[in-house]
Amino acid sequence: MFVSVIDFLKGSFFKEKLNNYLCVSMMSLLRVTKRNGELEPVQFEKVTNRIKFLCLGELRDGTKVGDPLDGVCYVTVAQKVIAQITDKITTSALDEDAARFCASKAKDHYHYGVLGGRIIASNHQKGTISNFSKTMQLLYENRKPDGSFYPLIDRRFHKFIARNARRLDDMIDHTRDFRLDYFGIMTLLGGPGKPGYILRRHDGALNVAETPQHLYMRVAVCLHINDFRPLNQVLDSIKETYDMLSLGYYSHATPTMYNAGTHCQQLSSCFLLGIKDTMDATDDINETDTDTEEDGSIPACWTACARISKRAGGIGIGLQPIRSRGTLIAGTGGNSNGIVPLIRVLNMIACYVNQGGRRPGAFALYEEPWCADIFAFLDLKKNTGLEEERARDLFYALWIPDLFMKRLITAIELGDDKRSVMWSLMCPHKCPGLYQTYGVQFEQLYESYEREGRFIHQIPIWDLWEAILVSQKETGGPYMLYKDHVNRKNAQANLGVIRNSNLCAEIVEYSDDQEYAVCNLASVALTSCVDTDTQTQTQTFNYRRLYDICKVAYRRLDAVIDINYYPVRKCKRSNLRHRPVGLGVQGWADVLLMLDLPFEDTVNEERKSTVINPHARELNRKIAEVMYYACVEASTELAAAREQGMSKLRELWIDNKIVFTDDGIDIVSMNGLSEEMQRLVEELRPIEGELNRDSHLGSYSSFIGSPAYQGKLQYHLWGVEPENWDLGDGTILNWKELEQKVSRHGLRGSLFRANMPTASTSQILGNVEANEPYKYAIYTRRVTAGEFVVVNKHLHKELSELGLWIPEIQKQIIKDRGSVQNIKELPLRIRDKYRTAFEVSKKTIQILAAEQGPHIDQSNSQNYFIAQPTNKILTNVHIGAWKLGLKTGMYYLRRESNQQPVQFTVDGGLVVNDKIKAADTGCVSCSA
């Protein structure tokens, strides 16, 4: 039939063609702003090809940056970017939009997150200087807004780089930036309101920033700044460290990554403080000692907290010496206000001295359950109640003696009569010595005070226990640490009774009001030790690689001790004397999935009964053994290497030709020394305590008298004798031989292993935090660009290969809050492997922790994920942890909200809004 021209012009077909023509015409008029500020017309093909090449793992010049990414449609990404182009938009903003869109698609395929990371890496490299030494030079020449010189990096560090610029520049492999996915590289780069790890200089028109590879090289160089070996050996060692960091084999803790090589190298994560129950610097009220640096008073503790928090340190404080409310103060005739007002001052310090303006200060306060103010202590973080009785910005922990747990179990066994078992609340001023003893000695002292009636109150122990559980259900805390377990297995037992842990409950070191313990942290990415057979595509765990990584990581952690800036003299004194470090793990759950292993196997699906997978259990134990063995061996090797030089220095020290202190050498006494002796002093950096003995001159100063000196390593303190075994390449873990080395040479440090939280560094490397299971199969990740939904990459890959990654199953996972347990279409083996942290038995988690324990000489920061905790569930969990001998019973209680999480739509698909109730958002200070 004939169609008139008028009808044709009115038709939808014509309108669609006209709209398309107009859109194309308008788009052709759009311009983009290049990085040099010039404008050029939009070239759609250029936009598409850029994303295409990165998807294929190449740069435009043909440089290979990774494998091709399957499951990713680069055309879709390009179309989305083109649709959002506005006139004069910058090419950098286009890249950011493309990467952000990729991140939003990570729920469809994890490779979108990889593509997003490649886009950001390419964008960042285009806006920075590729040359490492030139970047460091510009950071050194930084100026304040008023024009005054303010270098961002250390002068000595800068001079070393300038002298070795070519060698260091040649070591860097910029393609490794492209290994980081979107969430990892965005965590490194940071953004508005969230500082990243890289150093930046904003100086007028000059905008200088590190690349991730510059960051890793900066850390590597910093850790060798005191290395006095021949230059070629030092540079080889720098490259080894750089390679391990940039390839994701291990990571140093956040403070080390932030501050290495800067003008203030505060590289330590954890500070453990003691306190004395006095407001004065001396017990004599007639004295006027004003040295607040050295006294152990309450104001001295406040000052130390402010100084440490200013430099981004996480703090743990033992409050046990502080007298309870109502106790007489002899010096004034008044009565004590107890611990609450003191804690509120600490709360104000944490808020005011907010880690250099980057984030709130972070303090954890430790108290024992016999404290007369314990109920007020348990209420401090609650949302309700009088403001003058709350301090919600701090974290709280219990330091629990065995006697408390024994009486609690007795009460539970009595059933309805459980309130007949009593517990006495005491004041440390009226009942001295309780916090300074443990085990039988504590029990005898405590019960003698009960018989003498010296307690403040007596209460049913169940009432206190219920108050603890109520606080945990409401706030996620207090942490639970077991005082007697810590001290029976204390590798620093010759120093005294340990009274508290750190901010994240994994560091157990001696501290008091005169010595503040310090710990430097790093974590091994266990995923880097999984090898894939290229022919069979099967995976195996490479124990030899783990061994090598740990030896390197330990040596670098030991180097941190001498490089570090100490905010308080007591911290330096302690760290130089005892030299503890903490090497942990990340990616344990990823390793299990890569090796096709579940945490647990189902033995009866109807009854939902499970047992720990035996292969996972063996892997767990062997990893702990390798890590501890490697660290101890590296430590005794460092001690042996120092012996000859220390012997020469000791002769000079005995003849009074050189003077040392607990802080190092008296510089004046360097005058007149030969060049050889001066070099030895600079290389060995001894303190007086290391010279004041006849043997083990290469070991740390308090080694004599320690359990290790007596032939007892950590596994001996647990009553365990490990067996020798082959790492797979002929390297034998020979424990008796190791003990003989320790006996002969001593140890360079007192402590080696701690499993800390690794929130930030795990996100950078794309691993699950620490040794925790996955929280959900579908979950959210937060970076400066926003909050994005992602899928467990192992689950996505496995279900895709089976043809089961289909919309129906995805929706069921979302409906079940990120769980796959109710999806019967999935094989039982898969449902076992992908149990979430809420679904893995807490008993399994505890047994795995206990079987690592003989080879973790500090502790294990253990969260519990319990969807709806009850008093019965929590009681069983806590008693189970105590019976297994765990030092840290619980870090945080993580629970789901009582309300159904909101399920909202992103790009047409439902996702689960990850709402876990807990008291914190992750510890940055301890993240390693």
Task: List the model feature ranges, each with a label.
Residues V5, L9, L22-A928:
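Extended catalytic cores of very large enzyme megasubunits
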Residues K17-N19:
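Polybasic, lysine-rich low-complexity intrinsically disordered segments
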